Amino acid sequence: MFLVKSFHEGGLMMYPILALGVVMVYISLERLFVLYFRMNLNKDHFFKSLTTYLLKGDLEGMLLVCDQNPAPLSKVIKTCLIRLINKGTDADIQAALDEGALIEVPKIEKKIGYLSVIGNVATLMGLLGTITGMILSFKAVADADAATKAAMLTKGISEALNCTAFGLLVAVPAVLIYSVLQSRAQHLIDDINEVSIRTFNFILSNRERFGVTEAA
């Protein structure tokens, strides 16, 4: 098989590049599933359901909406609602939203930065393999006898080119998927910020209904 043959011709540097590729695939699949499925939540539908229960004064219903949608957004809002149920001040509610965001945002951004690192390191590993292959080629030209010179020169060039190719084969998808995941993470964080502000303003505009007092 062409890929297997190319891998063996690439020399020792192919193994760390392969390891980086395996890690890249694992992180990519895991983060794509988490960010696009497990953490997915329609913010407008969620906020509409939430305000319906808020206007009714149905505290159990509010928490049920959050529990039925176990996404970072709903978890942040749930911390706010718990503080509301406990008759916190507007400052307490704002602090609860901030606390919830500080807990959930790192979960959204988790592992994504590793893909950028893998992309850079895989490129450098490929470059290092290229350099070692070229060293082998120059050594063949300088030191080897005529009988082995052609074989060593071919081996060195093959090692250099295969390392470059495999390094880029890992680096390019890593960088592309990093960009996709980073964009998705920012979208989820923006949703948290938007719905947090909308919920906080909604509570303040119905201060008397919920018994929310101003901070001293």
What do the predicted segments below correspond to?
Residues 11, 25, 62, 77, ...:
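Residue-level signature of catalytic and energy-coupling elements of molecular machines
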Residues 151-178, 182:
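Pore-lining and gate-forming transmembrane alpha-helices of multi-pass membrane transport proteins
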Residues 10-14, 104, 108-122, 156, ...:
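Loop-to-transmembrane-helix entry motif
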Residues 40-128, 132, 136-146, 180-216:
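Predominantly long cytosolic amphipathic alpha-helical stalk/bundle segments
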Residues 14-27, 116-123, 129, 170-174:
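Alpha-helical transmembrane segments of integral membrane proteins
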Residues 1-46, 181:
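Hydrophobic membrane-targeting segments
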Residues 34, 162, 166, 201-204:
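Charged/polar positions within long, soluble alpha-helices
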